[in-house]
């Protein structure tokens, strides 16, 4: 009996991750969820000292793996027939590119901008309030509300720190219902 239990335990450890994502994808099928997506893979951390919001060449950007990861996110939303009400993105190029490759249409939303660097840290509380008010006004009777943003924003808002391209599903009261990791 112990041998069987051991093999069952070992087998469980090697179940593909997508299997564990099924429950999370099913949560999204009826709409009405708030979906936070950390931007897809962009090597490094933070942004260079000469960072300029209007100039992508001064920012940390998606590489080819990040582009593929973004495209995979979009393909999975289609494959699972996930209804999307609106997609909003941070104004950082890596977030906008993630949104564009995954969903096509999106709107910029400054409340989703990173507050990681000293230059923007002072905006953190204001952005959290603006984002909270936006979600409270959102009519959750339709599709899902999608935010493409940064580690620091998801962490500050949900107290969960996602990997690159990870999808975090919450209800309107911002209780985390599930997460989906998308490989790059």
Question: What is each stretch, according to the model?
Answer:
Residues 5-14:
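Bacterial N-terminal signal peptides
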Residues 14-22:
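Bacterial Sec-dependent signal peptides at the C-terminal "C-region" and cleavage site
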Residues 16, 135-184:
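Active-site-adjacent alpha-helix immediately C-terminal to a catalytic or transition-state-stabilizing loop
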Residues 21-110, 115-119, 160-184:
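Active-site-proximal alpha-helix that buttresses catalytic centers in soluble enzyme cores
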Residues 121-128, 184:
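Short, surface-exposed amphipathic charged segments that create phosphate/polyanion-binding patches used
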Residues 126-138:
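A polyampholytic, Gly/Pro-enriched intrinsically disordered region
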């Amino acid at each position: 009996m112990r041998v069987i239990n051991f093999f069952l335990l070992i087998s469980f450890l090697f179940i593909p991750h997508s299997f564990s994502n099924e429950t999370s994808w099913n949560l999204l099928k009826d709409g009405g969820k708030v979906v936070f997506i950390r931007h897809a893979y962009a090597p490094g951390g933070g942004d260079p000292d000469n960072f300029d919001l209007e100039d992508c060449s001064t920012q940390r950007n998606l590489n080819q793996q990040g582009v593929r990861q973004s495209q995979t996110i979009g393909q999975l939303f289609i494959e699972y027939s996930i209804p999307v009400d609106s997609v909003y993105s941070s104004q950082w190029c890596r977030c906008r590119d993630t949104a564009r490759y995954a969903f096509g249409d999106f709107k910029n939303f400054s409340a989703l901008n990173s507050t990681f660097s000293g230059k923007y840290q002072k905006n953190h509380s204001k952005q959290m309030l603006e984002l909270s008010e936006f979600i409270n006004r959102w009519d959750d009777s339709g599709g899902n509300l999608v935010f493409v943003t940064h580690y620091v924003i998801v962490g500050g808002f949900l107290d969960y720190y996602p990997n690159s391209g990870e999808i975090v599903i919450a209800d309107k009261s911002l209780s985390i219902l599930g997460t989906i990791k998308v490989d790059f």
